[in-house]
Amino acid sequence: MEITKDIRYIGVDDHDIDLFEGQYDVSENGMAYNSYVILGDKIAVADSVDAGFVDEWLGNLEAALDGRTPDYLVVHHMEPDHSAGIAAFMERYPQAQILASMGAFRMMVNYFGTDFPERKMVVKDGDVLDLGGHSLTFVGAPNVHWPEVLFSYEATDKVLFSADGFGKFGANDIEDPEGWACEARRYYFGIVGKFGKFVQAVLKKAANLDIQIICPLHGPVLTENLGYYLDTYNTWSSYQPEDEGITIAYASVYGHLKAAVEELASALEARGQKVSVFDLARDDMAEAVEDAFRYDRLVLASITYQGEIFPFMSTFIHTLAEHAYQNRTVALVEAGSWAPTAAKVMTKELEGMKDITLAQNKVTVLGSLNDASRAQIEALADELSK
């Protein structure tokens, strides 16, 4: 695929994968592993692909080269879904040099038993690779989301090669009816979300560049309305709510807490609120995490279980904390048969999170819903709708 006259897409689509990174469901739309080739007077290949697709990738490269030979392999990110083809490339093109950060070369030793010492070029923030007619300026992007990561900027065509930044779930040969944001958001908060301050740092560097195209390592090449993507990443990485709305995440066993959640959701919607509800035992938890970060208010609803909270709720709260959840209002709903303590446990779990405002009202379901707990639901709906 031609991106510009001299920059081609040579990546692959994976329709066999069910879980990305062993946990994120991509069974419906698959995954793309992107790679690019820059055809200057000299030729640079940007990144490789996952191990199961190396032969296909090398075939795509051969077609794009049209009889020419690559001079460089540029490694922006060493995660195996982008680096598995390095050894095969270096064997096929013995004259080619390999460029990467020092951290990436250390990882190559771990993965391949060598860092190709006679052929390696260590690059860092601000270094430039002149290809003749095109050049790559390297931008240090540590911890977006691994420590060795580099971005690079091609000045002639104004292209940012953004490693895992601006990526999304889904193969590129399937049109996503929900557009870019939904699966990009799930990808960001699942993969990159913990490292917001590092994303902020690289966005500040990118602000000084005239970017017309963004080439990520997953998902589509971005060519239009780039301000939207940059602004969205700024919102996500600064942990600010993207939209006004309320996410309700619940864990219920016999249905009494679920009934309370349904009444609360209806009460909130009757007050004009946008509400998103997730059963943590049955729904995709990554989507629940996504919406918890998307909206400005969150309701955690859990039964009391062995004096603690239900395991799915514990995992959910732990995942939020692990991804630096902050700057939100959180309300609590608890249930139990004789001595509900879930709200107390959840409150303690939230204490380590930054800038969390607990709602003054809470809902306690003792056994099943009654007039008292329904009144608490109405009071909480009023508070969350102010």
Give residue spans per PLM region.
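Conserved beta-strand hairpin/beta-sheet module of binuclear metal-dependent hydrolase folds
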Residues: 2-62, 151-154, 158-162, 257
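Active-site neighborhood of phospho(di)ester-bond hydrolases with catalytic His/Asp-centered motifs
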Residues: 46-48, 70-78, 98-101, 160-164, ...
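Short, charged N-terminal beta->alpha structural module
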Residues: 249-271
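FMN-binding flavodoxin-like domain, especially the glycine-rich phosphate-binding loop
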Residues: 172-214, 218-221, 263-278, 288-386
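Active-site metal-binding motif and surrounding structural segment of the metallo-beta-lactamase
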Residues: 41, 52-99
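Metallo-beta-lactamase
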Residues: 2-5, 100-149, 195-201
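Short acidic active-site motifs
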Residues: 85, 284-288
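Metal-dependent phosphodiesterase/nuclease catalytic metal-binding core
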Residues: 37, 151-187, 192-215, 223-250
